[in-house]
């Protein structure tokens, strides 16, 4: 399955690169209004006090119907706002929050993500498969 990601500081980009995912699309300020015409999993960081980055929100405004699940990066120093963008997107678009990871993720996070992407069933519908 395609993995769409946004990396404002490079951490999510490093996470995706380390995971070795080949079918990817990186959201940028320049392409955030482009259409993706296939199901995808979104990986994003969290900015400010738990907000969804604006390019991600713009992308979802155009492409939310293909969104299957979300994973989010954050910093545990932000307490309850850690990776909160993932919760926000999960609730707003009724998709599962696959996982949360800190900064660019650990090796264990990479293995977990690859396993979840590899086993993700596109036909599961928009029901919650795991709660964080």
Swiss-Prot record:
Top-rank taxon: Bacteria
SUPFAM superfamilies: Flavoproteins (SSF52218)
One family name in Pfam for this protein: Flavodoxin_NdrI
GO BP terms, alphabetized: protein modification process
GO molecular function: FMN binding
Function: Probably involved in ribonucleotide reductase function.
Family membership: Belongs to the NrdI family.
NCBIfam families named among the record's database cross-references: nrdI
HAMAP family: NrdI
Protein name, entry field: Protein NrdI
Provenance organism: Staphylococcus epidermidis (strain ATCC 35984 / DSM 28319 / BCRC 17069 / CCUG 31568 / BM 3577 / RP62A)
Gene: nrdI
């Amino acid at each position: 399955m395609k993995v769409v990601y946004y990396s404002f500081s490079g951490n999510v980009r490093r996470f995706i690169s380390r995971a070795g995912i080949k079918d990817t699309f990186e959201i940028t300020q320049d392409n955030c209004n482009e259409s993706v015409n296939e199901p995808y999993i979104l990986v994003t960081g969290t900015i400010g006090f738990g907000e969804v980055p604006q390019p991600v929100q713009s992308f979802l405004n155009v492409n939310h119907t293909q969104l299957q699940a979300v994973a989010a990066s954050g910093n545990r120093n932000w307490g309850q706002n850690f990776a909160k963008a993932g919760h926000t997107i999960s609730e707003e678009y009724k998709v599962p929050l696959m996982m949360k990871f800190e900064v660019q993720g650990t090796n264990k996070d990479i293995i977990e993500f690859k396993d979840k992407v590899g086993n993700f069933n596109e036909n599961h519908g928009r029901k919650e498969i795991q709660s964080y």
